[in-house]
Amino acid sequence: MSQGESGYISSCHSIVGAAKKIELAIVDNQSLNGDLSVIGKPLVSVVAFTSKTLNVYDLADAMSAKGWHLNSLQDPPAIHVAVTLPIVAVVDRLIVDLVAVVEEEKEKERVRIVEGKGARGGAKGDSAALYGVAGSLPNKSVMVQLASGFLDTLYKA
């Protein structure tokens, strides 16, 4: 299958446009910009973001539960979206789901505070477990072995 140079250029424009749409949603949407912040200046197809108010690994796990597989980052704790053509077609849905997940996580934080457990309750999801343990290790060289073991376990049938 060939799309030619014009098809390639069109795909690139679509991907960069969708990435920009995600970035602007995080920056401009009042439901997101109080809790999320974009890391750096996304120029092409990857948008990374973090939060000072919510556990980003819980956000990643909640997005995963909605069918999105965003990539967790460790230092700083963050998430990134690698925009591809399939994402372009559903970018508006991704943003709607991200808003919903942020609202759900904010509500969980409110409940934790009301219950006297304090803000930023313990992260409980898969991403939180992996990155929380890796981030707490004083010797970072063991992280490669940890990640390898995690992936082996995750993908064994």
Q: Which role fits each region the language model picked out?
A:
Residues 3, 7-82:
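Conserved small-domain helix->loop->beta segment predominantly found in fold-type I
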Residues 49-157:
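Non-catalytic terminal extensions of PLP-dependent enzymes
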